[in-house]
């Protein structure tokens, strides 16, 4: 898999794929060998109209989407009529509501980072209603042994979920409430909005991977959760139809790109990255290290019910084939590195590896990367970020090493809880995302996990995953085995073992234990998350 722009026939066709991330929109044109023929990207502007609010302007997002598609095709030297199909990958749980007749939004996109529903989250999680729900569901699970009741007994709302941010919007935006009463309201995550715009209002749909990340979808029954929607007074009538991940969603209106390109895939970004990494088999693991860390394991044909904070997701549904994932995340991975750069601990992120290896260890300094609390398996939104063990001998180099080590330590925590909870034998581990370019973090993660980790030649796995699904849908690629042969690996990181201890991560066992003490002291720091 590489980058190529010459030597094509006009009869050749190609796959377009767009990834709408938190900070950028990227489009690539792929050929049969999964080589990139052309690319274009644009920034996503985040808006902060009030403290804690994080929004995206829908018109600006749409303009950016159209721009990168046209730009990528132009960059490839190809023609739009050679684009066989379009795949779309998007950030999850960022949503908007709009008038189904006019397409006019009732508000801007409320992103997954938005905190406006924090008080609602605290209120609901501590309410008698939720305590009753948990009790009833535990009883139903005891009587029936059905895991979906166990899952319901463990439901805890967070601001990252769509659920209570949507409740906030329904409670606080009069035009939205009126539209719901009039039956003219549409709800949708970014993929749904793009489908609506691309088809000039003909399609109101999403796919199972995006729906499962909203926290108002029942992954066991494979439908919107009537129970949760009823509990939160969310009208089912505003929700989009849920389709297979590989599905002909419609045609791009010819007025947009000049030709009617079939839209053959919409997919959530982490699930798309999993597909792009060809993690098709039960036990395959993907670690994406970017703005945050997302660790996903393929759990096969059944959703995983977690008691430690792993989230059950639909990976994808292609025909009768449904693949589920269990996901753990650690927020603030990239944020910690960006913060250190802003503090001038280094000028270029590429320097961090050399800085970290320029000292033998962190000199007893530990960093806790909890700018947004701690997620699985600790699940403490009140945790604070901290440095511990500072002393007169501490230098910038020790601080940088401690920050990089903390990312690998959180990877170890997520991996351990994943092993403990799922009890699924690990078949392979692949890593992607911008932070995985750091060899120090990659090698330390391999050491701590005691596993070989493969790093791909290209890191834009969400885009590639959506392209793969779109291409399978039109027969551009025949099957998943063909896709595996197209995937190239930049480097394998093999675990180093301590000569004295002969155990995985043995060199770091004492350091990890000390870091975990620092972690405990950073927990429950704030009165409110």
Swiss-Prot record:
GO terms for molecular function: ATP binding; glycerol kinase activity. SUPFAM superfamilies: Actin-like ATPase domain. Pathway: Polyol metabolism; glycerol degradation via glycerol kinase pathway; sn-glycerol 3-phosphate from glycerol: step 1/1. Its EC number is 2.7.1.30. The keyword GTP-binding does not apply. Disulfide bonds: none annotated. Its main location: cytoplasm. One of its GO terms (biological process) is glycerol catabolic process. It comes from the Eukaryota. GO terms for cellular component: cytoplasm; mitochondrion. Pfam families: FGGY_C, FGGY_N. It is found in: Cytoplasm. It catalyses: glycerol + ATP = sn-glycerol 3-phosphate + ADP + H(+). It is an enzyme of class 2 (transferase). Coiled coil: none annotated. Glycerol binds at residues 92, 269-270. Keywords: ATP-binding, Cytoplasm, Glycerol metabolism, Kinase, Nucleotide-binding, Transferase. InterPro entries: ATPase_NBD (IPR043129), Carb_kinase_FGGY (IPR000577), Carb_kinase_FGGY_CS (IPR018483), FGGY_C (IPR018485), FGGY_N (IPR018484), GK5 (IPR037444). ATP binds at residues 22-23, 291, 334, 434. Belongs to the FGGY kinase family. Skin-specific kinase that plays a key role in glycerol metabolism, catalyzing its phosphorylation to produce sn-glycerol 3-phosphate. Involved in skin-specific regulation of sterol regulatory element-binding protein (SREBP) processing and lipid biosynthesis. PANTHER family: GLYCEROL KINASE 5-RELATED (PTHR10196:SF68), SUGAR KINASE (PTHR10196). This is Glycerol kinase 5. The lineage of its organism: Eukaryota, Metazoa, Chordata, Craniata, Vertebrata.
